[in-house]
């Protein structure tokens, strides 16, 4: 049996969402497919709750990128996100892949995962899922998706 919410989310993303964004499946058929893949109903339910929270937090209008204050991490965020993760989020924001609202959404969704710590690869998947769900973020999503599968990350100009 697979154990974490992130495992369920990654499976959904890799097998359903990224293949055909227009594919509409009802929750029951997705749940049956996930159970057949070996996920527990409890983890599947948590993953759907995670996705529901993500879709509820979708901004209605994309705002232009503006330079804002530097994000200061605290307590549980420092425990869950190591220096590589925090540096990566700063990199994405400085290179306008994420805006401040999207960064906060990534942080919210990362903190909602049932893991004590996230590594950089896990955080990249969270970023990719958030960007996939953001209207107007197609270019940022495409750049991020490319970065996920390159051996050596490409710089942003």
Swiss-Prot record:
Transmembrane segments: none
Pfam family of the protein (one): DUF494
Family under the similarity heading: Belongs to the Smg family.
HAMAP family (alphabetical): Smg (MF_00598)
Protein name according to UniProt: Protein Smg homolog
Record organism: Xanthomonas euvesicatoria pv. vesicatoria (strain 85-10) (Xanthomonas campestris pv. vesicatoria)
Gene (name only): smg
């Amino acid at each position: 049996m697979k154990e974490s919410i992130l495992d369920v989310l990654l499976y959904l993303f890799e097998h359903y969402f990224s293949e055909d964004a227009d594919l509409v499946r009802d929750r029951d058929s997705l749940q049956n497919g996930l159970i057949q893949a070996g996920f527990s109903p409890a983890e599947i339910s948590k993953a759907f709750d995670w996705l529901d929270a993500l879709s509820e937090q979708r901004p209605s209008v994309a705002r232009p990128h503006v330079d804002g204050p530097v994000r200061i991490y605290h307590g549980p965020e420092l425990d869950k996100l190591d220096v590589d993760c925090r540096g990566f989020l700063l990199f994405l924001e400085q290179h306008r892949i994420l805006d401040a609202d999207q960064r906060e959404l990534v942080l919210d969704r990362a903190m909602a995962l049932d893991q004590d710590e996230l590594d950089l690869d896990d955080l990249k998947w969270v970023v990719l899922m958030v960007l996939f769900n953001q209207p107007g973020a197609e270019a940022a999503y495409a750049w991020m998706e490319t970065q996920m599968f390159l051996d050596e990350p490409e710089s942003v100009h």
